[in-house]
Amino acid sequence: MKGSAFAIILGLVVLCACSFAEDEQDQFASPNELLRSMFLESRHELIPEVEGRYCQKWMWTCDSERKCCEGYVCELWCKYNMG
């Protein structure tokens, strides 16, 4: 009785693990897709300025060297200027 209950529980665990793995494969076409999406999202955080330097957007640390983009204010990190 204990052996069959263990086999049923083990079967359910394997079934859940397999379905989870299929969901993950559907979400990302390749293993590198997650890294690629992370870099594509962060790539837009830096915008070139006229002087060839880059300005910082929201949640990037800022100081006298690393200026915030237009419309953002520096308060340890760049925050959107609400007005």
Curated annotation (Swiss-Prot):
Expressed by the venom gland. The keyword Zinc-finger does not apply. Disulfide bonds join C55-C69, C62-C74, C68-C78. Residues 22-53 form a propeptide. One of its GO terms (cellular component) is extracellular region. GO terms for molecular function: ion channel regulator activity; toxin activity. The keyword Signal applies. It is found in: Secreted. Keywords: Disulfide bond, Ion channel impairing toxin, Knottin, Secreted, Signal, Toxin. Residues 1-21 form the signal peptide. It comes from the Eukaryota. The presence of a 'disulfide through disulfide knot' structurally defines this protein as a knottin. Belongs to the neurotoxin 30 (phrixotoxin) family. Probable ion channel inhibitor. This is Kappa-theraphotoxin-Cg2b.
